[in-house]
């Protein structure tokens, strides 16, 4: 990559890091009890900005180093805490956050790419069944310490892309005739999403 273009991209990321830092300072000084809407806007902006920065840095790594995308994303999956396990015939996937809202492309990429790498690594380490009919349950776990109004509608969440990735490894077809999908909300110690497939 041309050094001038590389420098321009790094400078752009540094500018976004400054904006992220400012958003975090603003979050830290905002009274969440008195100004919950302001806090929501600030925290959403900070999270999306951080995810955008991470994705841009990934693309920089892919285009400027010899590190393979799959290798990096496997490390990213571990760092994010993405877990894939099988217990008593149920494939259990844990994502370290709530699923992104639809139409937040960068946010989806941030989580979806490492999730795909984690599924691929898991499939290489042990044989996975090819299910013809299955039940999928998305458990949206919300931190019990946060206000209950944080609970979101299912129809605003990006479920399909995550189901498509899982389906590519274990389902013969994710057609509505062969795959029953359910959603549930829970309160827990921290935000996360659990996907159970049987």
For the regions a language model picked out, list residue spans one by one.
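An N-terminal amphipathic alpha-helical segment
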Residues: 107-150
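Short glycine/proline-enriched loop/turn "hinge" motifs that connect secondary-structure elements
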Residues: 83-87, 127-132, 187
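C-terminal edge-of-domain segments
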Residues: 175-198
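Short amphipathic
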Residues: 83-99, 137-142
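Short, low-complexity, polybasic intrinsically disordered segments
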Residues: 149-166
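Short conserved catalytic/interaction loops centered on acidic-Pro-aromatic/His motifs
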Residues: 149, 168-178
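N-terminal targeting/trafficking signals and adjacent low-complexity tails
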Residues: 1-72, 76-81, 85-89
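Long, charged, low-complexity intrinsically disordered regions
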Residues: 87-90, 104-109
């Amino acid at each position: 990559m041309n050094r001038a273009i590389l420098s321009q991209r790094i400078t752009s990321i540094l500018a976004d890091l400054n904006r992220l830092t400012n958003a975090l300072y603003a979050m830290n000084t905002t009274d969440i009890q008195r100004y919950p809407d302001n806090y929501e806007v600030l925290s959403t902006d900070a999270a999306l900005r951080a995810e955008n920065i991470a994705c841009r840095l990934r693309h920089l790594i892919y285009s400027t180093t010899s590190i393979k995308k799959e290798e990096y994303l496997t490390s990213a999956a571990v760092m994010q805490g993405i877990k894939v396990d099988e217990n008593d015939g149920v494939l259990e996937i844990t994502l370290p956050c709530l699923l992104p809202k639809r139409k937040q492309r960068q946010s989806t990429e941030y989580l979806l790419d490492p999730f795909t790498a984690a599924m691929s690594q898991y499939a290489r380490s042990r044989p996975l069944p090819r299910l013809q009919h299955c039940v999928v349950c998305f458990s949206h776990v919300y931190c019990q310490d946060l206000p209950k109004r944080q609970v979101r509608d299912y129809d605003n969440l990006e479920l399909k892309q995550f189901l498509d990735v899982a389906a590519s490894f274990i389902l013969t077809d994710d057609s509505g005739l062969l795959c029953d999908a359910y959603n549930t909300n829970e309160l827990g110690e921290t935000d996360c999403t659990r996907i159970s497939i049987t």
